[in-house]
Amino acid sequence: MTREQSARLLPQKPSRWAKILLNRKVPILLFLLLELAFLVFSYLSLQEHFPSIILWEHLLSVFTFFYLLNRSMDSRSKLSWVIIIALFPIFGTALLYFSLADLGVRRLKKRLEDATVQASDYLSTDPEVADYLSQSDRQLQRLAYFLEHSPAQFPIYRDTEVTYFPLGDDMLPALLEDLKKAERYIFMEYFIIDEGIMWGEILAILEEKAKAGLDVRVMFDGMNEMTTLSYDYIERLHKVGIKAQAFSPVKPILSTYYNYRDHRKITVIDGQVAYTGGVNIADEYVNKRERFGHWKDTALRLDGSAVQTLKALFLTMWTVT
């Protein structure tokens, strides 16, 4: 299967001119530039009509500098902000407070926290596993305790077979074979999905399974709609029976919302088999296309009860998206 053939497993994309006219990038970038220009114009107008505002801005920058020094924050982030404010006092201060305000994100965080709490009710460590660790390896027991009592509350599992793939090239055949064996559902969540040979082979199976009545869901980061996928890709997936969502899609509004991206790479099949790791769904990850030389990213295949955690992670994100 060639890259050109695999990219056409879904209905043909719009023509070149239609794509240019309907591309979401154009209006989104235009609106963002207009918003930025409005903010700059408003600021310059204030300076012109109220010269004393400059003094207050510098005083605010000094206050912000000391506020940063006493704030609980990663030292590298703190240093970065200090440098920005030192070089660009007014712009840096405004940018910091805009970032801290997290406009448009608080409701998302609340929904994610609530969904995580609900998911944790279904995930718990088997007491026998904890007893086994306490008797076999104290170091592993401490690590397990840390994971179980972390904010995410990851349970510990024992009866799970793990297969390591040193390359995406090694992972793909196994993934395709497991997808073909699916009987109930397939959940896929990826940071990058790019049309090509890899996605074409996966998509052919997903479409077949969806027609057979399986629950097939695909979720990708919203930035894909600006980079690798067409603006109507979710609708095109729906037409072939695949449920699809984009996490944090880019909209024509200035917001720190866009800092929150979904970098997960997860496939869950029937709650029994799962894949995760660093391999996205794009041809360079399986060396079907050379982009930056020979591409190396690793992946894991899980077969057993530990898959339940990955299933919960997927459904949690699916619920809040």
Enumerate the language-model features and the residues they cover:
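N-terminal localization/anchoring segments of enzymes in phospholipid and broader phosphate metabolism
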Residues: 1-321
